Amino acid sequence: MTQFASPVLHSLLDTDAYKLHMQQAVFHHYYDVHVAAEFRCRGDDLLGIYADAIREQVQAMQHLRLQDDEYQWLSALPFFKADYLNWLREFRFNPEQVTVSNDNGKLDIRLSGPWREVILWEVPLLAVISEMVHRYRSPQADVAQALDTLENKLVDFSALTAGLDMSRFHLMDFGTRRRFSREVQETIVKRLQQESWFVGTSNYDLARRLSLTPMGTQAHEWFQAHQQISPDLANSQRAALAAWLEEYPDQLGIALTDCITMDAFLRDFGVEFASRYQGLRHDSGDPVEWGEKAIAHYEKLGIDPQSKTLVFSDNLDLRKAVELYRHFSSRVQLSFGIGTRLTCDIPQVKPLNIVIKLVECNGKPVAKLSDSPGKTICHDKAFVRALRKAFDLPHIKKAS
């Protein structure tokens, strides 16, 4: 055992809301689908030296289970069905689905197994990696420093928004996966609760314990998996959008637009989808350009943009959120999800730019071709070419 062997995680609900939302949809629609996912560090950090400590934490995760009070709380939410929650009660993480190794200094992690199970690994595992690395690298950093940084930011925020009508400004905590620690995230969220514009968190455990609204719908993996689930690649994005509405016909209706670029998404997002979904989420590319495209698309379809919500969640901080609010607030409803810049903002601490992304579904490749080339992920060049052709995409620069 290492000196840092105490478990990082204490609750199965210490994860992002959209993981449970997607897991229920997978449970009902794609019970037998198998997937594989891989870890990526987008920065230059050599994290392989932490492999043993991370492997210990993975083993510890098998002891997490849904507690009775957590089950009761989930049961009271409007979108979970009894069959899924009863299954979730019996769910346990299976460490055999995870391989962790030190590949010449690089951290190598691969997940594989039934999608209904593998889907829950990503967020808590990233939170574990982030917290373990920061325990080693920054043992002197603490919660008080994180809170001081936030207080200074809130002073600047007040000055920045003086005289601005903030009644349509809505901020959410999206900071679980790259947080400095569980304790820092909870402290930051508790402080933000004092602000009228703070509306919720993506973390189900915090939402339950702090009586907050849990926030989240679906992630890239929902669209990626449909690239192999759908018999027609060109129709896969529409199939993903339709399947989501089958599971959630009138709630959790914010659609993620950049699995295969915003332009390709809008070509698939016709009047029925645009009417039924409550809005769209931005996660790559220029946010102003994206928002203008979204508003123009709604107007072209004869839909009032004021009846829809745009959610911005790509590398945001408070200043960027205010800039976007100034630009768009008179034309559309807005929400802003901030992650790392809230939950890992401590002097002399370098946040990790880490992800875990789907790479296979039923043994075949899947891809993410976002509006930021550096966020593109796929091993199989032939499949990327097929995807570009199916969605009539221009050439996309090579990315990590």
UniProtKB/Swiss-Prot annotation:
Top EC class per UniProt? ligase
**What chemistry does it catalyse, as a reaction equation?**
nicotinate + 5-phospho-alpha-D-ribose 1-diphosphate + ATP + H2O = nicotinate beta-D-ribonucleotide + ADP + phosphate + diphosphate
Could you give a GO molecular-function term held by this entry? nicotinate phosphoribosyltransferase activity
S-S bridge residues: none
Gene Ontology CC: one annotated term:
cytosol
Query: Which Pfam families does this entry report, sorted A to Z?
Result: NAPRTase (PF04095), NAPRTase_N (PF17767)
| Pathway per the UniProt entry | Cofactor biosynthesis; NAD(+) biosynthesis; nicotinate D-ribonucleotide from nicotinate: step 1/1
Residues where Phosphohistidine is found: 220
Q: Which InterPro entries match?
A: N/Namide_PRibTrfase (IPR041525), NAPRTase_N (IPR040727), Nic_PRibTrfase (IPR006406), Nic_PRibTrfase-Fam (IPR007229), Nicotinate_pribotase-like_C (IPR036068)
Is Phosphoprotein among the key words of this record? Answer: yes
Q: Which family does it belong to?
A: Belongs to the NAPRTase family.
| Entry protein name | Nicotinate phosphoribosyltransferase
Source species of the chain: Escherichia coli O45:K1 (strain S88 / ExPEC)
